[in-house]
C-alpha cells in the first residue's frame, strides 16, 4: 500500500504544483492514446510498480514521496505505446526510435534536479510505464471500448482509496 500512498504525498506546494502540471500534461497525452480510464489505471499501476522497484533497489531506509514516479510512468506509457504500436513512420531509424529517444530526453531534462530529486523513482517510473505502454498495444483493439474505460478509471480510484484505507487501518 505504501507504493501507492507515496504517489499522493508531497513535500510542499512547489513539489505538488510541478507534479500536477507535468502529470496533467503527460496524463493528457496518455489519455489521448489509451482513453482516460485505461490511461489513469496504467499510470497508477506502473507508478506504484516503479516505487516498488525503487524501494527494492535502493537502501532499505530510502523514503520516496510524490507523484513524480507516476508522472514519469505516464511519459513512459506514451513512449512505449507509440514505439510498439509503430505509430511513427518506420522508414528511418530516427523515426522508428523517436519515441524512445524523445521519452528519454524528456526524462533527462525534467527528471533530474537538485539533491532532493529521486532520480531512481523517475527512472523506474519511466521504465515501468514504457513496459506497460508497450504491453497495452496488445489490447489496442479493445481498450477504447467504454466498459474498459469505466473499469480502468474505477480501478485507478479503487487502488488509491484501497491503499489509503489499508494505511489508515494499519
Where in the sequence are the language-model features?
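A detector for small-residue-rich transmembrane helices and their helix-helix packing motifs
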Residues: 1-170
Amino acid at each position: 500500500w505504501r507504493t501507492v500512498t507515496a504517489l499522493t504525498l508531497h513535500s510542499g506546494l512547489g513539489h505538488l504544483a510541478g507534479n500536477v502540471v507535468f502529470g496533467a500534461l503527460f496524463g493528457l497525452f496518455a489519455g489521448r492514446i489509451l482513453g482516460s480510464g485505461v490511461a489513469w489505471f496504467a499510470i497508477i499501476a506502473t507508478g506504484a510498480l516503479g516505487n516498488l522497484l525503487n524501494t527494492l533497489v535502493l537502501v532499505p531506509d530510502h523514503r520516496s514521496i510524490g507523484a513524480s514516479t507516476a508522472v514519469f510512468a505516464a511519459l513512459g506509457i506514451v513512449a512505449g505505446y507509440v514505439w510498439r504500436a509503430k505509430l511513427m513512420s518506420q522508414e528511418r531509424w530516427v523515426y522508428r526510435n523517436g519515441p524512445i529517444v524523445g521519452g528519454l530526453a524528456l526524462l533527462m531534462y525534467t527528471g533530474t534536479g537538485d539533491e532532493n530529486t529521486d532520480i531512481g523513482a523517475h527512472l523506474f517510473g519511466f521504465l515501468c510505464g514504457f513496459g506497460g505502454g508497450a504491453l497495452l498495444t496488445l489490447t489496442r483493439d479493445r481498450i477504447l471500448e467504454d466498459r474498459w474505460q469505466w473499469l480502468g478509471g474505477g480501478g485507478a480510484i479503487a487502488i488509491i482509496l484501497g491503499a489509503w484505507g489499508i494505511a489508515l487501518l494499519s
